[in-house]
Amino acid sequence: MTEKEGTFRFKQFRVRQSRCAMKVGTDGVLLGALAIVENQESRVASQESNRPIVKCLDLGTGTGLIALMIAQRNPEALITAIDIDAGAAGQAAENFALSPWADRLTAVCGDVRESGDDGKFDLIVCNPPFYEHSPAASSVARDTARRTDTLTHEQLVECASRLLVNDGRLEVIIPYATTDEFVHLGWLRGLHLVRRIDIRTKAAKPYKRSVLSLVKIEELKNGRIEHTHSFLTLLNPDSTPTDEYRELTRDFYLDK
């Protein structure tokens, strides 16, 4: 159940959003559901065992939705959620306190570009600003939340490379048209693509979003890195959710 200026209800938690410029949306739900939050086989030459996902950072958290979804999916995760907007950080803190995982969620108001937590996080998730140099949004807060003038993709990958542990992972959802450029920016910073999922609303529509998984690797174990590439369609021709989308979100949406 959703109210634009009120509360969005999920199966295990609620998201209040009246003080956030950017409301709960499909992009955030997709990243929260698709992000790899479980332990994965190490790709680092000096590391033999799997790296556990424990310390996580939700960059530009907004309402805290993605952090809450990660907390639900991974019972071991300790999640820090940062936002440059005080209203959003305060709203996220409120949502965390009302959730079943309040002891594992921390909201911080700050600029990630000034963070001193170098090499701290196993996982960084981000639903970043999605347009550059576009006409101003309807409010200063919304403009700050949406414009890549505030945090560019280049700055995002630089921050992720600095803040991740070796073998740590960056999970993002970005516009499909910017995917190749983003992957290249990541590669320049030692973040290597391991998974790509292209997403469209309907089969007759063009792809609009991509969810990318990039791993920080300072020394490769077996040389070249291969990545998987898959596709997701959200709606059937009659606008009902596809079986794949229903399955993906069944643990979250009340009506799935």
What are these regions (language model features)?
Residues 37-55, 217, 222:
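Short, basic, low-complexity termini and linkers enriched in Ser/Thr/Gly/Pro
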Residues 31, 127, 156, 214:
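Residue-level signal for inorganic ion chemistry
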